Structure formats: structure tokens, C-alpha cells
Amino acid sequence: MSTAKFVVPKAVENVRIEKFCLKLLPNIKLSQFFKLLRLGKVLLNNTKAKLGQRVSSGDTIVFQFAIEPYLHNHSEVVDLTQVQDDLQVIFEDEQLIVVDKPAGVVCQPDAKHELFNLANSLLKHCGYNQYFKNSLSFIPRFAHRIDRNTCGLVIGAKTNQALQELEAVFRHNLLMKQYQGLVFGPFNFKGTQKAYWAKDAYQALVTVKAKPFPNAKPITTIFENSKYLTKLDLSLLTIRLVSGKTHQIRACLNLLNTQLVGDRKYQLLQFKNRNRDFKHQALHATNLSFAQLDKQKFPLLANYSQRQFKSQLVPWFASLIKGVSI
């Protein structure tokens, strides 16, 4: 039986095993790796590995299958010469960086935006002219993302410890995310919406329902304020995410029988004609606020307890609602 053994390097701390292994084996499909996990073909410290387990420096991973087909040249270099340092920085110190992302910019590289994206702009801002693709070494990165056509605040880490703690902050919902959005028609719901969310990876869509359904996870969205703009037949909303799932706000609005202005993916039939003239969805990530952080659990980020960041970007839909605030 073919086996391969790896010792997790120093730069890696508290990373999900599937995330680590997919970087190590860049040509393996996620479904293939999950199957190998279920079959016990991946060992972590001499014990059958499980999905979601976390690995750190010094841990030993053994693959009990031929890994050669899933490898490629780890020295592949991404040249950032053409990338501009055009970040709109709201806050920056030695550990963290908070930026305003314009609508239309993707947060992470993908097939259509391999070079020009927010992640590469961050690297250029931090002095990188190149980096090694699929490297397991730490590089500055954002701890979350917002949709391409959403504008506003994104927070990233400039050190490995800051990244690990920041990811834990997100997992425990200790960073409040507030948005402003514009929807069609009057909006009468106010308060906390508890629902259930599941993602269809093949269609890049999510489903949100009021009651539990197979493979769904609970989510919480708070609709804090709304103002109906009578002449425009639009409503301006203030929304706070407790959980932070993909397309959460957009799909939750569908559950309430409305949608964001400009949203094509979650477009409702009754708004199709009115929705044609808008290029981006009307959603703006306006505020990020740290909760009170435990010094023992977050030795680095505890210093940012109660710290708030406010977007300085003027969203594209501001011209529609000039003079309106909620």
C-alpha cells in the first residue's frame, strides 16, 4: 500500500484538516478527499482523521493512498507586478487591516479574477511582489469575504496569530457585522429572524427556510430599522448579522418576500422589470464591531475589545436615497 507522511510546518496553527490537505494536494477534488476521510485513508497523529479536525505545527498526517496524481509544482509563483496597491484602508496596524471594498471587486482569486482581486491587492499593499501558489507558509489575508457586488468593510490579518484569533472570533460570532440595504416596496418586519440555511455548491445558491430541513444550519439575522421611501417605493434597511453565512441577507429577504435592489441571483418575479436597470445589488457593509474578548482565549485580539470600524465608502445607491438616513 502506498503511503506518504507529512509533518505540519511551524507556520500552521489551528487549521481545519481538509483546508490544509487541499492545499497540500491541490489537484484533489473535495468530494474525493471527503471519501478518503470516510474510508480511513487519512491519519492524524496515527488516528483516523475526521472532517473538521484542526491541525497545528508538529502534527503528523499520513496519507494511505498514492498522492502523486494530486500534486503539482509547489514552486509556482504568482507575479503581482501588475497588481496595484489600491486598497481603501480604514484602519491598519501591525496585526490587523480593515478596508473598504468597492462593488464589483472579488475578495479572493477565482478562475475569472486570478490576478486582480482584493486578496492580491492586500499582498501588494504589504510589500509582496510575488508569492508561491499553494504554499503552506503564512501570508497576509482577509478572514472573511463579502460578495463581489456588495461594497463595504472587510477585515484581514497581517500575522499568523492574528489570523488564527480572528477566525476564532468569527466562529464564535464575536464580531458584529452591520449592513445597509435597499429593497423593493415597503418592509414591515422588524426584529430577529431565526431561520435555517443550506448551500447548493453546484449552483452557487443558498436556501433559507423558516423551519429545519435536511443539512440545514440555524442562522440569525436582525432587521434593526427600516424607512419606506414613498416616492421611490423602496425601503432602506439596517441589518445586523449574528451568524454570517454565504448570501445570508439576500436569501433571508426572499423568505420575507422581498429582495435587494439590483440582486439578480435572488431576484423575485414581481420585481424583475424594476430590477433591470441596476448593475450591482444595493448592499453596503457599513460597520464592524468587536465584542468584549476574553484575554485568555484571545491574548492578541483582546486589545481590540469593543473596537468599532465604520465604512467611509459612499455606496452606489446613495444617489437614489440622497438625504435619507435611518
From Swiss-Prot:
Domain S4 RNA-binding: 15-76
Keyword Kinase (UniProt): no
Positions of the catalytic residues: D147
Keywords linked to the UniProt accession: Isomerase, RNA-binding
GO biological process assignments: enzyme-directed rRNA pseudouridine synthesis
Entry's Gene Ontology molecular function annotations: RNA binding; rRNA pseudouridine synthase activity
PROSITE patterns according to UniProt: PSI_RLU, S4
Coiled-coil region list: none
EC numbers: 5.4.99.-
InterPro entries attached to this UniProt entry: PsdUridine_synth_cat_dom_sf, PsdUridine_synth_RluA-like_CS, PsdUridine_synth_RluC/D, PsdUridine_synth_RsuA/RluA, RluA_PseudoU_synthase, S4_RNA-bd, S4_RNA-bd_sf
Keyword Nucleotidyltransferase: no
Gene3D superfamilies: Pseudouridine synthase, RNA-binding S4 domain
Catalytic activity reported: a uridine in RNA = a pseudouridine in RNA
SMART domains: S4
Family affiliation: Belongs to the pseudouridine synthase RluA family.
Protein name (Swiss-Prot/TrEMBL): Uncharacterized RNA pseudouridine synthase MG370 homolog
